[in-house]
Amino acid sequence: MLNEFKEFIARGNVMDLAVGVIIGAAFSKIVDSVVNDLVMPVVGALTGGGFDFSDYFLPLSGNVTAQTLAAAREQGAVFAYGNFITVFINFLILAWIIFLLIKLVNRARASVEREKAPEPAAPPPQDILLLSEIRDLLKQRA
């Protein structure tokens, strides 16, 4: 059973999946940085200057009077929809980047396949076709 497990792990698909998961984890940090350090400041500047979605919340308790999410959570229950907005924007950016990467890879594969594809053979000349028909007819009579 141990040998079967070793064979399973050594397969290309499992190794490719492992590499993909590791790269995906690292890529997630890059996307988080793009969203938090590049996109969100621009969104904040366009919408009135320097606000942060993470402090958007609705108090679910009458005791909550704080202006920041961390302080509001200490006072009572809150509906922290700002974090959801940030995560959703993060997801959209990640999905867009993955879409562009897949499109780029598919385009590269298609160009490589076009280069590898042999030119279709030119049809034989009419005289060769005629001679082939005559040969076939002679074989049938014999």
UniProtKB/Swiss-Prot annotation:
The keyword Chloroplast does not apply. GO terms for molecular function: mechanosensitive monoatomic ion channel activity. Keywords: Cell inner membrane, Cell membrane, Ion channel, Ion transport, Membrane, Transmembrane, Transmembrane helix, Transport. GO terms for cellular component: plasma membrane. Disulfide bonds: none annotated. HAMAP family: MscL (MF_00115). This is Large-conductance mechanosensitive channel.
